[in-house]
Amino acid sequence: AAQLDGNFVELAGQAAAALSEIRQPLIRLGVRLEALIEDAPDWLDGQGRARIEGARYSLAWRIDTLSAWESLLGRMGGYDGDNLPAPDFVDWLAVERAEGREFDVGLHRRFLDPMKPFAKMVLEPSHGVMLTSATLRDGDDWQSALARSGAPYLDVQPMLASAESPFDYASRAEVLIVTDVKKGDISALAGAYGRIIEACGGGVLGLFTAIRRLRAVHGRIADRLARGGLPLYAQHVDPIDTGTLVDIFRDDPAASLLGTDALRDGVDVPGESLRCVVLEQVPWPKPTILHRARRAANGGSAHDDRIIRARLAQAFGRLIRSADDKGHFVVLSSAFPSRLLSAFPAGTPVHRMTLDEALQHLTSRAFSGPGAGVVAPEEERNPLG
């Protein structure tokens, strides 16, 4: 178990043994009650039977709870419920909170590599499988693509194929990295979103990494934009399902839409309705226990970079959906490491500039053309370490 000393693991084993001593008598009592129901004596009436059934269900619930805690304590030493080593899993205890209140405590288990069960349950029984995605491969790295597909768990050698994009990103798109929006300043972030939407005349897809910031930005700018004839819709704010929000956004070139992961990974809005994608910050992975375990098993910071590049590529992919599309991809963060720029298609111009300079670009809809992007060698240490 990560970050647990030997004494802690030993105490966990003692606690598991103590819980087992409580659970075993409950099991025996449950068996006796079940036998009493099956071979009921003459004096057992309907009410008595109902009380015994209730006691059985109550005992079963307590037995299951104790078993779960025993399993957790066993996992602290790196073992599963059968006292066998369990290196393929990550276990943790989490408190669920809503609106500042704690309402549940959960014992969670996930595969260290989710592709292992995927390969067993989906790939192995299939006659043939085709996996395709614009972000399956990280640059020219086929090894990462194979790992993401589950192919290493199969005995067959997969057939590999790649195709170049038909779109001219170098002359149809620009990446603008805005350097003067302070991180954590919601007012400045909202002001930047509002000014960008006004400069573009709508047609903006705003992507957030946190629902709280999305709601805060929407609350500050929606009324002002609406008065200017620029409707603003938002996932997690408007009581409309995501598919309908996207349809409304697609049908109104003056509308803009704010959202989170679902919009970053699955929106198809070609044409004038989507002219600009705005990302509030670099989409770093959340430093959860599960992520830290997978990070440690897959190369540390290189694992994080692969995730971020895939997310950036997905977000950028919302912008150009047909040969006639053009637009800008704006990142409101100066802390954008140059090593992540490979997420964008080769030849796409990339600029670091202030918000005012970015607004001039958006207002004129000017494109600098191939090879015009000049990027300062600015790096940031991954906040996950």
Feature locations, PLM:
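Conserved RecA-like P-loop NTPase helicase motor core
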Residues: 166-174, 178-184, 237-339
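Acidic, Ser/Thr-rich peripheral helices and adjacent loops at domain boundaries
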Residues: 150-152, 294-301, 347-359
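Conserved C-terminal RecA-like helicase domain
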Residues: 182, 213-215, 219-244, 248-249
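Conserved coupling segment at the C-terminus of the helicase ATP-binding
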Residues: 1-224
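Conserved, well-folded catalytic cores of nucleic-acid-processing
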Residues: 148, 196-199, 224-228, 252-255, ...
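Short hydrophobic/aromatic-enriched beta-strand-loop microsegments
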Residues: 228-232, 275-280, 352-353
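N-terminal targeting/trafficking signals and adjacent low-complexity tails
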Residues: 330-385
